[in-house]
Each structure stands twice: as C-alpha cells, then as structure tokens.
Regions:
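Bacterial signal peptide processing site
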Residues: 16-20
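Short, surface-exposed beta-strand/loop "edge" segments at domain boundaries and coil↔beta transitions
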Residues: 79-81, 86-90, 114-119, 182-193
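Long, charged/polar, surface-exposed segments that mediate recognition or autoinhibition
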Residues: 90-149
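Short beta-strand micro-motifs in enzyme catalytic cores
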Residues: 76-81, 104, 174-176
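Post-signal peptide N-terminal segment of mature Sec-exported envelope proteins
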Residues: 23-49
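A cross-family detector of function-defining hotspots
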Residues: 52-96, 134-169
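Sec-dependent bacterial lipoprotein signal peptides
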Residues: 1-14
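Polybasic, proline/glycine-rich intrinsically disordered low-complexity segments
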Residues: 148-201
C-alpha cells in the first residue's frame, strides 16, 4: 500500500511540474514585452497593461478576453460631473480586437445626460483622455477641442487614426464617442457604445 501511495505522489509531482506558466509568470512576460514598446505601439500591443492604465481613471474595466469572434474589455460607467444630479453625466470605455495579443480599437464615450453640468463633464472627459495618452507620451495637440465644442471630427492623434463622433441617444441627449484605431486593426465589429444608440452598423 505504501509503495502505491508513493507512486501516486510521484505521479502528482510530475503532473505539477509539467504545468504551464503561472499567472505571475505571464504577467512578467507581458510587462517585459510592453517595456520594449512605446507610444501607440505600446497602447495597442500590451492589452493587460493598457487596461490597467485605463483603470487608473476609475473605469474598472474587465480583462481583455474572448467575446464571440473578437476580444473585448469593458469599463464604466464613471461619473464625470455632479454625482447627486438626477442623471449624472457618465463615461464608459471599451477595447476591442481580433486577437488576444493586440487591441485594434480603444473607445471612450461620454453620455451627456445632465445638461446643467455638461461643461464640467466635457472638461473632465478631456482630462481623462489626456491623462491616459500622457502615459504613452502622446499629445492630442488641441484635437480634443472638438469635444468641448461638441463637433464631430476625424484625424490622426499622435499618428494613430482617431475620430470624435457626436450623436444623439434614444432620449435625444448628446453622446460623444472618441475612438482610437490601430492603423492595421481588423476588428470585425464595433464596440457596444455605438451600437447602443443605433448610430453604428
């Protein structure tokens, strides 16, 4: 009986020794990979780190993980103005991509549901965006002025294709969606924010 137990123990040890890398080992590998990149290459090419940096602004985004044919991470809503308003202005975040290794699209959305505090919300939204981009040494060079004026705009920001879309939600209130695209991104679907208000395919 003892020899059988000993044999079983050896089998278990062998099985444990043959297991794949641990979570900590994967995180260390991701961090090492991220350290070799900079700018947008790092923002799109290091999903785990990017989600962590987004979460510094309170979005509490989920892990970047498989969701049907794509990979998604979703965060928010976060309150961007008077929290005790009947319907505070809020922001949400999504990252989408075709593979686990890279993000193809970063989407930040501001829903203006409290007109009385809309200017404050837009200002804070811009601060969040600039704070996020500053971690990668990226400057919008005034491009986010379209947010405060509630004007749709398209053009590169730091070399990456970007768009600011101002649409109306089901209740007629403004929704400002800022999208940053990886130049070679191939995500086959748009994140949910655009679909929710019926303004995207």
């Amino acid at each position: 009986m003892r020899s059988n137990l000993a044999l079983s123990a050896l089998v278990l040890l062998a099985a444990c020794g043959g297991s794949g890398p641990t979570v900590l080992e994967n995180e260390a590998k991701d961090a090492a990979t991220a350290a070799t990149m900079q700018g947008w290459d790092r923002a799109f090419g290091a999903p785990r780190e990017t989600i962590g940096r987004v979460n510094q602004f309170g979005y509490r985004a989920t892990d970047y993980a498989a969701d049907g044919p794509t990979f998604l991470a979703k965060g928010g809503p976060i309150t961007l103005s008077q929290s005790d308003a009947k319907a505070p202005n809020t922001g949400t975040f999504e990252a989408a991509g075709a593979t686990a290794a890279k993000i193809d699209r970063l989407v930040f959305t501001l829903s203006l549901t409290d007109a009385a505090n809309a200017e404050t919300a837009k200002k804070r939204f811009v601060e969040v965006l600039r704070g996020f981009l500053s971690q990668y040494g990226i400057d919008d060079e005034g491009g986010f002025g379209a947010i405060t004026s509630e004007q749709s705009a398209d053009g590169p920001i730091g070399g990456a294709p970007a768009s600011i879309d101002v649409t109306k939600g089901a209740d007629g209130r403004p929704i400002i969606t800022v999208t940053f695209n990886r130049p070679t991104g191939t995500t086959p679907v748009f994140p949910d924010q655009g679909q929710a208000d019926g303004n995207r395919a």
